[in-house]
Curated annotation (Swiss-Prot):
GO BP, sorted A to Z: xylan catabolic process
Annotated localization: Secreted
Listed pathway(s): Glycan degradation; xylan degradation
Residue(s) at site: Important for catalytic activity, responsible for pKa modulation of the active site Glu and correct orientation of both the proton donor and substrate: D189
Record field: temperature dependence: Optimum temperature is 45 degrees Celsius. Thermostable for 40 min from 4 to 45 degrees Celsius.
Protein name: Arabinoxylan arabinofuranohydrolase
Binding site for Ca(2+): E385, E387, N409, Q410, D506
SUPFAM superfamilies: Arabinanase/levansucrase/invertase, Galactose-binding domain-like
Gene3D superfamilies: Galactose-binding domain-like, Glycosyl hydrolase domain, family 43
């Protein structure tokens, strides 16, 4: 469905460009919202909302609600109704700039959702995921929590951060009837935290009581946030949930630990009269000496995304540590705004640094398009999945039949003349590269131009892609390269004369001299 919707989107872009008398593509296709040199949004070839991070084995994984464009009968874009939030998108990176697309986890399975492939057969939706890893019986086990709309929390398990996933209990983990959950207006937005002793905790909840006419007291102290202890198996709960009296609570629970202190963070609501230290739509935070609370309000650290990027909407975040640096991942309506001039409620993931002060307070985050810098160089002499890139000129990704990772290998597709992908800071070394190979599949054929630092930069090699006999008939092709030494952005520019998708692109690798 995402592929179909995305194709419809590019048709719309082409039609609009024709009406304006301008080509939708120049000699090389332009970026949408993540422009060359910037790190935000993390991706712009598809959307992703409510992001949360997991760091594992030298990579950071970002899990997101499956925002996807909805269309009116005339082909125009609707405002987001969240009807497509039944999957979880996953991307990962070792360097914070080049992101690998791992595709979608088909979470919800009720009423034939996800084409009957949905994992949680009882769930009609999968909103706002959270993720944790814990060693159980000597083996790392991964736990993906999600909200079934606003009615409860479910959990999936896997032996790797990208699956395959199963539903271990076949029902919700937490519902309104769970002890201590009474009074929660929206039982959603889970945040899971595993403490140093291996004990897990689940935070969730939101909303303001009073239905359509809350009082000032209800706006100020909704008392709709909860924390409950998880069992050793992470798929059961222990005892009763405790209330977190988060002032002006709206949604979006988060928990991180810094210097022995527990930080509960959340999105402040938009109603009533707010004091200056609790501004509407921003991320507030509280601290405690215990993961179960009580928590004390300390301040706020992330303005509503509309303050930085326009578009407004809800604010959703997660704080994480990666290679001894603290970051916050959040969403903003940047990609949809770039395409349509208005966000329409469709969101994309961003990351900026987060700083704790010496007194334990958190500095205001300066959200921006620049984002974070690349923390390590990419090794071009390793096999690199084509769906790993920092920037792109209007391509798509889709599930592949080519042999790849343990689950859900992807490839780059919807390749037209002038499209491209690029990676940041590949280190060829002093000796440089002597050859380049790629795994491709094609009915039409074309070329991959290998260029340095820009889409029209120094040409170091050209790979001719023949027809392989089909869009899923894979063949590894190799060509000589010259002049690729040192550290560079690497652009793979696609050319060809055929109509339609020129070829599919699975992976690439350089050989060292």
């Amino acid at each position: 469905m995402r592929k179909k919707c995305s194709v419809c989107l590019w048709i719309l872009v082409l039609l609009l460009s024709c009406l304006s008398g301008k080509s939708a593509y120049a000699a090389t296709s332009t970026t949408i919202a993540k422009h060359i040199g910037n790190s935000n949004p993390l991706i712009d070839h598809h959307l992703g909302a409510d992001p949360v991070a997991l760091t594992y084995n030298g990579r950071v994984y970002i899990y997101m609600s499956s925002d996807d464009y909805e269309y009116n009968s005339n082909g125009t874009i609707k405002d987001n109704s969240f009807a497509n939030l039944n999957r979880v998108f996953v991307i990962s990176s070792a360097d914070m700039v080049n992101w690998t697309d791992h595709g979608a986890i088909p979470v919800a399975g009720a009423n034939g959702a996800n084409g009957g492939r949905g994992i949680a057969k009882w769930a009609g939706a999968s909103w706002a995921p959270s993720i944790a890893v814990k060693k159980i019986n000597g083996k790392d086990k991964f736990f993906l929590y999600f909200a079934n709309s606003g009615g409860g929390i479910g959990v999936l398990t896997a032996d790797s951060p990208i699956g395959p996933w199963t539903d271990p209990i076949g029902k919700p983990l937490v519902t309104p009837s769970t002890p201590g959950m009474s009074g929660v207006v929206w039982l959603f937005d889970p945040a899971v935290f595993v403490d140093d002793d291996g004990t897990g905790y689940l935070y969730a909840g939101g909303g303001v009581p009073g239905v359509s006419n809350p009082t000032q007291g209800q706006w100020a102290n909704p008392k709709t946030a909860r924390v409950i202890k998880l069992g050793p198996d992470m798929t059961s709960v222990v005892g009763s949930a405790s209330t977190i009296d988060a002032p002006f609570m709206f949604e979006d629970s988060g928990l991180h630990k810094y210097n022995g202190t527990y930080y509960y963070s959340y999105c402040i609501n938009f109603g009533g009269t707010h004091p200056a230290d609790k501004p509407p739509g921003e991320i507030g935070y509280m601290t405690s000496s215990s993961p179960m609370g009580p928590f004390t309000y300390r301040g706020h650290f992330l303005k509503n995304p509309g303050a930085f990027f326009g578009g407004g909407g809800n604010n959703h975040h997660a704080v994480f540590n990666f290679k001894n640096e603290w970051y916050v991942v959040y969403h903003a309506q940047t990609v949809s705004s770039a395409l349509f001039g208005a966000g329409k409620g469709y969101r994309s993931p961003h990351i900026n640094k987060l700083v704790h002060n010496a007194d334990g307070s958190i500095q205001e985050v300066a959200a921006n398009y620049a984002g974070v810098t690349q923390i390590s160089n990419l090794n071009p002499y390793n096999r690199v999945e084509a769906e790993t890139f920092a920037w792109n000129g209007r391509i798509l990704t889709e599930k592949s039949t080519a042999p790849g990772g343990p689950v859900n290998n992807q490839h780059v597709t919807s390749i037209q003349n002038g499209d491209w992908i690029a990676v940041g800071n590949a280190d060829f070394g002093a000796g440089g590269a002597r050859s380049f190979k790629a795994n491709v599949a094609s009915t039409l054929g074309g070329k991959i131009e290998v260029r340095l630092d820009s889409a029209d930069g120094k040409l170091v090699g050209t790979l001719n892609v023949p027809s392989t006999g089909g869009a899923q008939t894979w063949r590894e092709i190799e060509t000589a390269v010259s002049g690729a030494t040192g550290v560079h952005k690497v652009f793979f520019v696609f050319t060809g004369t055929g109509t339609g998708n020129l070829f599919n692109f699975d992976y690439w690798q350089f050989t060292q001299r």
